[in-house]
């Protein structure tokens, strides 16, 4: 990595301070060592929202634009109230706040602060583990270390987000040393956390290599980026619908995705779909011989999560927004839309722009974001 990664940018506006507060809030909310209380989390959320809204108002948008912002915020606010989580609203407000900003500067800002804060967290977590703290779980006979985060998958998600931000920021100047360094890092964290993120990263690296060597492949990526999310959404729903009917393909996909289809089917057959979201924080599974599990519940798949928990209306909005971003024709952005779509088959972190950054591309298609669109292909200095 370039030595300039050591340089931490100074916050220079309400936007920067708001984003920094949200980075800290996100890491604390996912930490077992420094987990923030509900009150602290709410205070950090309130501070960040005030800062981001102040930045939006400082842009002196016209009444029509502000009304549109208010409508979008209210819609997502209602959804967040329905599901009992403000995470999605934070992403929306962040996207609205950076509408007229240089998105590469914003991503670089997030990358550098997350890199250092997560590195410090992992170092302290590793030392604490060596000193006897149980930041690990025994899973099918092997140990999965979380380095102080609530789950090994959370550690993996943060590392994966850093990796894809790094690739996006250095896209025009990537070299073999970058690939080797990232693969070594991912292999190391695979040994620590025992997650499949390294598999997705390997596919991603191969994808970039093919794109540089094959123009036809580039055209294919542009096409896939437009339709990946609706295709995978439909595929997930069909597999979920067929699971309880004993469909062999559905069960095979379920095994490949480590029970994610089965969990979605369990929820779907008891709750159905939702348009504007529902609160599932207290939803648990009871023993069922067909499904073979009981206890806590999680989706770990964005598409089933949106269909059954968050609301179909949000899924449709994401489909439209990412289609419009893909239609802009930026090969770099389209690669990462596809990465987001594939990664979403195994995680729900993609709805947080601070845990899976490509959702920030939504800012590029907000009406009036001309400066952002003009800059989207600009080549910035390497990080």
Question: Language-model features: where?
Answer:
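Hydrophobic transmembrane helix bundles of membrane-integrated enzymes that assemble
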Residues: 2-30, 41-248, 269, 292-375
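Interfacial loop-to-helix junctions that mark the boundaries of transmembrane helices
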Residues: 36-39
């Amino acid at each position: 990595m370039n030595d300039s990664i050591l340089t931490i940018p100074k916050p220079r506006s309400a936007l920067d301070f708001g984003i920094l507060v949200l980075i800290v809030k996100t890491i604390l909310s996912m930490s077992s060592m420094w987990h923030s209380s509900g009150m602290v989390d709410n205070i950090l959320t309130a501070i960040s929202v005030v800062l981001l809204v102040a930045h939006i108002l400082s842009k002196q948008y016209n009444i029509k634009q502000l009304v549109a912002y208010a409508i979008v915020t209210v819609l997502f606010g209602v959804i967040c109230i329905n599901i009992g989580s403000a995470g999605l609203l934070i992403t929306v407000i962040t996207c609205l706040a950076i509408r007229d900003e240089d998105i590469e500067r914003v991503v670089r800002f997030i990358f550098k602060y997350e890199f250092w804060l997560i590195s410090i967290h992992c170092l302290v977590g590793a030392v604490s583990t060596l000193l006897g703290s149980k930041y690990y779980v025994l899973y099918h006979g092997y140990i999965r270390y979380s380095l102080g985060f609530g789950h090994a998958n959370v550690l993996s998600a943060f590392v994966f987000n850093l990796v894809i931000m790094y690739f996006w920021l250095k896209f025009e100047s990537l070299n073999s040393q970058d690939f080797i360094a990232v693969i070594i890092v991912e292999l190391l964290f695979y040994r620590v956390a025992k997650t499949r993120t390294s598999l997705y990263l390997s596919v991603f690296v191969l994808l970039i290599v093919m794109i540089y060597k094959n123009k036809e492949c580039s055209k294919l990526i542009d096409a896939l980026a437009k339709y990946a999310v609706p295709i995978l959404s439909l595929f997930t729903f069909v597999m979920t619908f067929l699971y309880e009917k004993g469909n062999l393909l559905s069960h095979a996909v379920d095994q490949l995705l480590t029970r994610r289809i089965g969990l979605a089917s369990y929820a779907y057959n008891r709750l159905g779909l939702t348009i504007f979201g529902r609160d599932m924080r207290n939803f648990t599974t009871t023993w069922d011989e067909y499904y073979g599990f009981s206890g806590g519940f999680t989706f770990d798949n964005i598409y089933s999560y949106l269909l059954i928990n968050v609301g179909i209306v949000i899924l449709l909005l994401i489909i439209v927004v990412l289609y419009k971003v893909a239609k802009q024709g930026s090969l770099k952005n389209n690669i990462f839309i596809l990465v987001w779509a594939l990664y979403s088959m195994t995680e729900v972190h993609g709805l947080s722009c601070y845990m899976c950054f490509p959702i920030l591309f939504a800012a590029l298609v907000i009406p009036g974001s001309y400066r952002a669109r003009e800059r989207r292909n600009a080549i910035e200095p390497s990080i």
